[in-house]
């Protein structure tokens, strides 16, 4: 027996060495866009082994010289695929240049520090918005969905034609929702209003290359506004969506969309304030407020912006804002979307936030304060889960618009609502190295971008920087400081690790890029394992970084994590504009 043991010992030792070598695999995750000289600069070290590291180095990429050696700080423990993690904080280093980090045998990709690292990123994401246009599509240089659409649920006879061509396709399908489109339009308008110097004019209003004296972001916002006008053509008419989940029967280019048995016409659903079809069930619509409130807010902001650009359009926007406000009051409650084949819908459950947003932008201070008090904190903040788009638009835009018009104690009180929500997230986030406490539900990246905006707004309104590291961590997550080490935006940065095989017809059928599209992002392993119709078409290059906690695939077959969305991208446009503007101050 002893003889056999000694014969096996070298093999056993070799096996132990192999195990150690495998479990000691480690990576450093960074924001691939880079960092600003005076901003928070943190990378995350993640290891398959359990040993902590004492320090890390910042190294000049050109000379190989160590310019900074810092303590790796306390070990943060296991997270997702990693057994040990550290936050590598190099915020004190401010010299512009190109660098990499080294910690043990782990080495980060190159990254830049500079005031200009975010320049042009917001405009880059507008490429995806233009590509999502319905009607004339400038990317295709062709038209689609010119026969929208025939009515359902309206006061007019079913199948009445209404001209509603325009707007944006919601995602890689070609559905068009008023709720997401109004929210996207509002974000683009606010981005122009708050950071006008960030945006360039290199495209015409129709989305083709050229210029027209108008910033491209405002051209894109107006594309959304003009469609919202079609969806609210009369004071007592408002439509909720074009098309439904019959769209999901297969990928195709937009102009070949004929899924509804009526040639190229698509259904247009009227907002009734009553439940409508949801697969074999009915949705939980209770009123008209959530979608109409978003319309009112977008129109009101547009009225202010266009006052010195196009007076007639400004007056039209002001009138429509009031009209949408009144429509929202017809039956206080939430408007959910409709589906025919499956139960998957945008199951929005809150509406007072939308009414606060509408009231604040319409300068209805007392109404806005009343609605704000009814839902001071967006309900998902600090929670582990939520239904798909249950608390939309993920943060309360109304608090920001209201705080901008208030003073004194009223202003402090509204700002405290943001503080409370951020604190709920922070109490969970500070337990892991990624400062991650966003639920891994569908469109987790959209929640991430929105939460980063809330942190930014809180900092701007107060000057309080206590949550700056949390804000930056959520921003960094979207560009590679995550377990997978990938940016979640197609093509950004240009030479980075970004999605290349998204769930999108343009890339899958046409082999065309979808520059600037923010993909849905990781989901809980439990969600991924229970979704219908997911099948990976290629080996998983991120297999070492998958876990039961969260899954992400850069694979056409994974519609749950790798499908870009129009509204998430519009939110990201605002966030990127904010970061570029802040870096240049």
Residue map of PLM features:
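Short, compositionally biased P/S/T/A/G/V-rich stretches that sit at domain boundaries
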Residues: 21-33
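Active-site-adjacent structural elements in folded domains
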Residues: 278-283, 338-346, 381-386, 433-441, ...
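Short, glycine/acidic-rich hinge or "gate" loops at secondary-structure transitions
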Residues: 199-207, 237-241, 312-314
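Carboxylate/His-rich catalytic cores and anion/metal-binding grooves
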Residues: 217-242
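Acidic, glycine-anchored loop motifs typical of Ca2+
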Residues: 206-214
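Aromatic-lined, polymer-binding surfaces characteristic
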Residues: 292, 296-306, 314-366, 375, ...
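Aromatic (Trp/Tyr) and acidic
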Residues: 32-109, 115, 130-186, 191, ...
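Bacterial Sec-dependent N-terminal signal peptides
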Residues: 1-23
């Amino acid at each position: 027996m002893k003889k056999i043991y000694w014969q096996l010992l070298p093999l056993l030792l070799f096996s132990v060495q192999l195990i150690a070598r495998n479990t000691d695999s480690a990576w450093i995750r960074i924001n691939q866009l880079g960092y600003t000289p005076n901003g928070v600069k943190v990378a995350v070290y993640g290891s398959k082994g359990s040993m902590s590291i004492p320090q890390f180095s910042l190294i000049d990429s050109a000379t190989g010289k160590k310019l900074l050696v810092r303590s790796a700080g306390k070990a943060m423990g296991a997270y997702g695929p990693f057994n040990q993690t550290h936050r590598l904080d190099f915020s004190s280093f401010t010299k512009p240049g190109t660098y990499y980090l080294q910690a043990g045998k782990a080495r980060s990709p190159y990254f830049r520090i500079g005031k200009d690292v975010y320049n042009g990123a917001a405009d880059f994401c507008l490429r995806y918005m233009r590509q999502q246009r319905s009607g004339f599509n400038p990317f295709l240089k062709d038209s689609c969905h010119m026969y929208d659409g025939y009515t359902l649920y309206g006061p007019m006879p079913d199948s009445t034609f209404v001209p509603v061509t325009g707007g944006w396709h919601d995602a890689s399908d070609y559905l068009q929702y008023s709720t997401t489109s109004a929210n996207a339009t509002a974000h683009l308008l606010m981005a122009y209003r708050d950071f006008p110097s960030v945006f360039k004019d290199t495209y015409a209003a129709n989305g083709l290359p050229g210029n027209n004296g108008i910033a491209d972001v405002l051209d894109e916002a107006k594309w959304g506004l003009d469609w919202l006008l079609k969806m609210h053509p009369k004071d007592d008419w408002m439509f909720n969506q074009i098309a439904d989940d019959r769209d999901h029967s297969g990928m195709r280019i937009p102009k070949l969309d004929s899924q509804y048995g009526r040639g190229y016409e698509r259904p247009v659903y009227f907002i009734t304030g009553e439940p409508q079809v949801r697969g074999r069930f009915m949705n939980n619509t209770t009123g008209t407020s959530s979608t109409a409130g978003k319309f009112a807010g977008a129109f009101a902001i547009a009225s202010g912006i266009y006052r010195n650009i196009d007076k007639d359009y400004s007056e039209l926007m002001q009138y429509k804002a009031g009209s949408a406000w009144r429509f929202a009051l017809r039956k206080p409650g939430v408007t959910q979307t409709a589906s025919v084949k499956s139960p998957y819908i945008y199951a929005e459950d809150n509406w007072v936030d939308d009414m606060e947003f509408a009231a604040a932008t319409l300068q209805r201070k007392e109404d806005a304060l009343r609605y704000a008090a009814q839902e001071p904190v967006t309900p998902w903040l600090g929670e582990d889960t939520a239904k798909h788009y249950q608390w939309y638009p993920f943060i309360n835009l109304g608090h920001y618009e209201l705080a901008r018009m208030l003073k004194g104690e009223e202003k402090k009180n509204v700002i405290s609502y943001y503080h409370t929500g951020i604190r709920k997230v922070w109490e969970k986030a500070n337990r892991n190295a990624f400062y991650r406490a966003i639920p891994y539900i569908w469109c987790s990246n959209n929640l991430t971008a929105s939460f980063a905006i809330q942190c930014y707004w809180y900092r701007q309104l107060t000057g309080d920087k206590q949550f700056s590291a949390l804000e930056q961590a959520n921003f960094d997550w979207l560009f590679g400081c995550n377990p997978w080490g990938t940016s979640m935006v197609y093509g950004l940065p240009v030479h980075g690790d970004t999605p290349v095989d998204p769930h999108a017809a343009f890339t899958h059928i046409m082999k065309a890029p979808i520059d600037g599209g923010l993909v849905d992002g990781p989901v809980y392993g439990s969600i991924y394992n229970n979704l219908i119709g997911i099948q990976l078409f290629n080996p998983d290059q991120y297999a070492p970084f998958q876990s039961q906690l969260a899954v992400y695939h850069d694979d056409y077959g994974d519609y749950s994590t790798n499908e870009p969305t129009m509204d998430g991208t519009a939110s990201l446009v605002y966030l990127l504009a904010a970061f570029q503007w802040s870096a240049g101050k």
